[in-house]
Amino acid sequence: MPQTRSVDESFLALPLSALTDAALTRALDLGCEHADIRVERIRTQTISLRDARPEAVTDGEDLGLAVRVVHEGTWGFAAGVVLTAAEAVRLAEEAVAVATVSAAINSDRVELAPEPVYRDVTWVSEYETDPFELPDAEKTTLLTEFSERLLAADGVEHVQSSCMHVKEQKYYADTAGTRTRQQRVRIHPDFTALTVDRATGSFESMRTLAPPAGRGWEYLTGSSWDWGRELAEIPELLREKTKAPSVEAGRYDLVIDPSNLWLTIHESIGHATELDRALGYEAAYAGTSFATVDKLGTLQYGSPLLHVTGDRTTPNGLSTIGWDDEGVAGQEWDIVKDGVLVGYQVDRNMARLRGLPRSNGCAFADSPGHVPVQRMANVSLRPTPDGPSTDEIIGGVERGIYVVGDKSWSIDMQRYNFQFTGQRFYRIEDGKLAGQLRDVAYQATTTDFWGSMSVVGGPQTYVLGGAFNCGKAQPGQTAPVSHGCPTARFDQVSVLNTVQEAGR
């Protein structure tokens, strides 16, 4: 899609150059080896409905600036909300003071991997309709209409609906001379239907599979997702789910839809290949990683069919950017190739620690008040160029389960032992779907699971999934991230009955 949008004038009208000159000049005067400044404005809105009636509309805006320095080999950071040159000078001085105090306990001298200088460059994400330019009433009307379609169906007792959209505007400048201006928009619509068995008091739910996307309001009104088909199908699928038999625990061949597999990629590959986890720098929030650096180039992560890439360039990706929060341009690289671990996600400091020639652009802060940390790229399983369709993959399974949609999961602090559930499950008998199942969870270790992958679907099965709210760091930060993948088959995976397990 040709890029026709630009960064909003209201953001460009902020005193970006004056703040830059004040902060960076003062940092250099104080002897910093490196300094950078970020000015950010982040707008969020969430519209929530219950049973097709408005429940809440929440709006938020976060505007501020942050100064980060390297002084005598130590990080310093300070942030504020007053956009004046005097405040920028004060923040530079405060960041240097933080670095001076921290130097006494810093055992690893901070050095940044080199990056070309990008002078006065601009990037805007691919979207057509800015949701923040539409009246709330117009957005609520469409969400109400979609909700009413579900609520009118037999057996649907309640419908919970929401749509969250975000506009992120970011200016970055550093002492090397880079100056970047960026704007990106993302959206996450969600519709959940619920049915209640009044005789037993039990209930079941099912929600739309549409993933969050780096798109605008056109995601709900255009052709990139078939909302009409999905909303029409959910009530009948939900009725089938309520009558489905409980799964018999055992080992099955699994055919996993992209709507479920993206989350397994996120937890068992995405987080496991963040270099700060692999080095032990990140541990408190969800652990370190079994994929340690001594295994790079030798760890058999999965079958030879496993090809996983990281990127910050995929169109409509949630982690897609022009430049990261250290001024590094978006790139694509291999993480797992032919089943072997070959790469990590890194920022400039981690790249230098490992002797890499360059960062692959994985620094991100979720607000102007937070320091950038190493965050996840779009981490994706590549399809087989001439690979089979989903129906063809199912057709090759004698006894198995087809897994659709994400739900709950758990994974250990090394990103190794895990289990995942889903939205719906279908029994496969002699290559055909034979009705839904309930109470299914699949369980494995990361390398056993990916090692059991025997078929990878073609490009026609590929879907870009993802999440708005990947958590990391302390104080906690959230980041949006996409994971593309095709349908894939996994042989003889352990399946648990969740009801039986809960009663143990």
Model-identified regions with their sequence ranges:
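N-terminal small-residue-enriched
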Residues: 1-504
